[in-house]
Amino acid sequence: MSLTIPSPASGTSTSATTDTAPAAAPQRTYQVRTFGCQMNVHDSERMAGMLEDAGYVPASGENADVVVFNTCAVRENADNKLYGNLGMLAPVKAANPGMQIAVGGCLAQKDRETILKKAPWVDAVFGTHNVGALPALLDRARHNNEAQLEILESLDVFPSTLPTKRDSVYSGWVSISVGCNNTCTFCIVPALRGKEKDRRPGDILAEIQALVDDGAIEVTLLGQNVNSYGVEFGDRQAFSKLLRACGEIQGLERVRFTSPHPAAFTDDVIDAMAETPNVMPQLHMPLQSGSDKVLKDMKRSYRSTKFLGILDKVRERIPHAAISTDIIVGFPGETEEDFQATLDVVEKSRFATAFTFQYSKRPGTPAADLPDQLPKAVVQERFERLTALQDRIAAEENARQLGRRVEVMVTAQSGRKSEETHRLSGRSQDQRLVHFSVPEGAEKPRPGDLVTVTITEAAAFHLVADPASAADYSLRRSRAGDAWDRSQADSCGAPVAGGGAGSNGGKGGVSLGMPALPVRRS
């Protein structure tokens, strides 16, 4: 679907012809604002890559010539967040003739014309299947002085073939599939991203190799349901084979993936995780509910016994695995007995982290039409009980890490109190967030380097390592750290000593894997 809709006129100016050649027009700047999941974060990298390929440059501050919103449609507050942001930009655009606003992603795929009706100052709306159209839509909107709406109903080109500006030089997202064949009643994503489409293994491995050649030492394999990878070309063990193939890539030190589905999580994947050294001892396994009745209503096609059995198998093969999950509270028809079943499964599962959500009614999903929608007060009370339980479990599980020696990959992001504590931050192999200090006289690591430290403090959402002396601190400078040095030198226009593989400019803006804190929704 492609529509052209009149938009507010952008100011233009003309100047008298002179004998001197006009100065070159300054490059237009851009900013991409991302809402939602890791898939959206990676899509935003593609949007940035395409804009830079078209001659745009990143905005140095808040003011940009082009602002792109990459949206989420999973929860109601995603709508509110988008339209709130668009409302705040309306006067900014009115005061800056030539500024453009574009909206893409899942909410754009869903709302389509509604976005232009609610925010007629938007210049371009595009969906999940035509991310590559963004630069052309912006150009067309400027040329025609009309808003452009283009939504495709199926994938135009697999997005990983598009230019990409990586947010991190030491870690990278790699899509192995897009879309989903499941029919969970609460989820609108399959309707917006379509049926599952798989990349060929050779294409995936080539992209990973290119990332490693540029200095990355960590990748996260992305898909709506990664362990169903291979369904398009008829190989039920394709995902486990892909994990093992990642283990053959020299220089690739950490492999993660998100997210799998319990119904199709098979023993060959667990074996590949356990037997491939660079596949990290970390698993995100969405539970959603511990009640078999609610799981049936959700059309999740597994039950609590199967879920707990998967965790048992993983921990048997990978004893130190950290397991995280997603849980929805207040699904229509959830009784107190159903909720207690969820609490029981959470207690048994001993999750390192749980991302807990209050059910949000989404038009267009089967669950939105179910009877027995729960009162807000009931959902809130259950949510608070669940988060209190999980916070206790997380603190207990982290306390078990005290005294352990862990290898931490240093990230560009620091903790909120880093200026006070002078600690740096990073992720352990099992994806726990670790804040650590560098002993006096020891060499300071760069983002992408690896340090080995002993855990000295534990809290529910992070660990602390304060080495008593330099003898309790080990630094391994990495190719990823070299890549970070080069990227910083490139951004400053300064030379840097060589080391490691070829350069891939960028900044360390995105931490891979799951967020550090559970998502709190009120």
From Swiss-Prot:
Q: How is the cofactor bound?
A: Binds 2 [4Fe-4S] clusters. One cluster is coordinated with 3 cysteines and an exchangeable S-adenosyl-L-methionine.
Going by the UniProt record, its keywords in alphabetical order are: 4Fe-4S, Cytoplasm, Iron, Iron-sulfur, Metal-binding, S-adenosyl-L-methionine, Transferase, tRNA processing
The MTTase N-terminal domain sits at: 28-143
Q: Which reaction does it catalyse?
A: N(6)-dimethylallyladenosine(37) in tRNA + (sulfur carrier)-SH + AH2 + 2 S-adenosyl-L-methionine = 2-methylsulfanyl-N(6)-dimethylallyladenosine(37) in tRNA + (sulfur carrier)-H + 5'-deoxyadenosine + L-methionine + A + S-adenosyl-L-homocysteine + 2 H(+)
- What enzyme class is recorded for this protein? transferase
Q: What is its main location?
A: cytoplasm
Q: Name one GO cellular component term.
A: cytosol
EC number annotated for this UniProt entry: 2.8.4.3
Molecular function (GO) terms listed?
4 iron, 4 sulfur cluster binding; metal ion binding; N6-isopentenyladenosine methylthiotransferase activity
Q: Where is this region: Disordered?
A: 1-27, 481-522
Sequence similarity: Belongs to the methylthiotransferase family. MiaB subfamily.
Q: What is this protein called?
A: tRNA-2-methylthio-N(6)-dimethylallyladenosine synthase
Originating organism:
Arthrobacter sp. (strain FB24)
